[in-house]
Curated annotation (Swiss-Prot):
General function of this protein: Protease subunit of a proteasome-like degradation complex believed to be a general protein degrading machinery.
EC number: 3.4.25.2
Native source organism of the sequence: Azoarcus sp. (strain BH72)
GO CC, one annotated term: HslUV protease complex
Annotated disulfide bonds: none
Annotated PANTHER family: ATP-DEPENDENT PROTEASE SUBUNIT HSLV (PTHR32194:SF0), METALLOPROTEASE TLDD (PTHR32194)
UniProt-recorded name of the protein: ATP-dependent protease subunit HslV
Active site feature: T7
A UniProt-annotated Pfam family: Proteasome
Family the entry assigns: Belongs to the peptidase T1B family. HslV subfamily.
This protein's record includes keyword Coiled coil: no
Compartment list: Cytoplasm
Catalyzed reactions per annotation: ATP-dependent cleavage of peptide bonds with broad specificity
Length: 178
């Protein structure tokens, strides 16, 4: 799976709570052009969490398409994700978009890729972007060895990723569904 530079997005679930967070750094090549971008948001009346890694304009196009799928399928995350992935695979314009989405509701956490894949990682941890592997490793260790809330796991994991990945900073946005 191709990783896109310029961000870290992480989702963690524990008990009845799920959180999704990301950093705010936007880069153009090797230059930081913005430090406080908001790459994480709530969708479908606050019932769905979503974050993106990749080109900003591409991600906003995908957010719009995904929101339309959520509306069409009454907020059904799995069905909306599969329908978006189908469109992404078959539509010529969408196939050119370079972004990935991490999405979550109260029951599922998914990665939607431009290859038409809809993945539900094990252990309720989703990570995308250039710092995703660092954040995922930190989150897994924190989930297995602490009682921290999903929000706190994400905050600490993104901080670790920001220390290690040059495309990830310490300006975080975290959304939670309790």
């Amino acid at each position: 799976m191709e990783q896109y530079h310029g961000t870290t997005i992480l989702s963690v679930r524990r008990g009845n709570s799920v959180a999704l967070g990301g950093d705010g750094q936007v880069t153009l090549g090797n230059i930081v052009v913005k430090a406080s971008a908001r790459k994480v948001r709530t969708l479908y009346q606050g019932q769905i969490l979503a974050g993106f890694a990749g080109g900003t304009a591409d991600a906003f196009t995908l957010f719009e398409r995904f929101e339309a799928k959520l509306d069409k399928h009454q907020g059904n995350l799995l069905r909306s994700a599969v329908e978006l992935a189908k469109d992404w695979r078959t539509d010529r314009m969408l196939r050119r978009l370079e972004a990935m989405l991490a999405v979550a509701d109260r029951e599922h956490s998914l990665i939607i890729t431009g290859n038409g894949d809809v993945l539900e990682p094990e252990q309720g941890i989703v990570a995308i972007g250039s710092g995703g592997a660092y954040a995922q490793s930190a989150a897994r260790a924190l989930i297995e060895n602490t009682e921290l809330s999903p929000r706190d796991v994400i905050a600490k994991s993104l901080a670790i990723a920001g220390d290690l990945c040059i495309y990830t900073n310490q300006c975080h946005t975290i959304e939670v569904l309790d």
